[in-house]
Amino acid sequence: MLFSAIKVTMQNRLSKYFFTLTNNKNNRSFLKLDVSLQKTIRLTYILNIETSTKNCSVSVSNNGKLVGIKELNNGNYSHAEVLHPFINDVLNEANITFDKLNAIAVSKGPGSYTGLRIGVSAAKGLCFSLGIPLISINTLASLAHSISIEDGTIIPMLDARRMEVYSAIFDVNYNQIREIKAEIIDENSFLNELQNNNVYFLGDGAEKCKSLITHANAVFVDSKFPSAKEMCVLAFDKYKKNDIEDVAYFEPFYLKDFIAVPQKKKL
């Protein structure tokens, strides 16, 4: 005799899952619930912090899906003033409290020395106080994930002052195929990549390269900054792999040493 199929519903998901159970004691069996359902039995909330550029961005994700975001790019580094209010705002938007967070993810760099310090300090403080793991995200990888292409390569660039940028190269599947570099851009930059296929340049370092990189295969994507939105999937993937940092010893990836600029004397 076959019992009626039982409908299983979890976390307001639309998908329906069924199992059947036989009354034969020697052949009692059931169909396993779908793997995707098993993964949603526990909700994983991650707070994502991005402060590597002028864009101060904070998001909350649930199993890799964006459920709250707040960001501001007003041309100034106002991260110290807005970061903590933004954190409270996104938690309210996601309708959760700090104790529901499973991890904190932070953009590790490269980028602004001051911006990275602010974001990492906040992330580490939360991890210590909440007793949850810290996840670091490659800033350029996160930026690369903000666009989708069918062919060619992606070169995210972050401004490193004057004609220097922080850059890396990614393929269509977001695999990093060249290490991160601090490099001075000239008319010969990325010629090998440009000769083969389209190259998509993006980030706040790409704008100043337009006048130098004029190859027909060069495509410049406007107005792209690293955002906590793209961190959601990346952070959840690392969380599932237990790819976490030592909170006590973690430091941002500056790539270059910080050089203080002397202030001008007031007359």
Regions found by a protein language model. Give the residues of each.
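Short hydrophobic targeting helices and cationic amphipathic motifs
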Residues: 4, 19, 28-31
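N-terminal beta-alpha supersecondary unit
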Residues: 41-108
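Surface "functional belts" at beta-alpha junctions
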Residues: 41-42, 65, 133-226, 254, ...
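DPxDG-like acidic metal-binding loop motif
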Residues: 103-134, 139
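Glycine-rich phosphate-binding/hydrolytic loop that grips phosphoryl groups
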Residues: 221-254
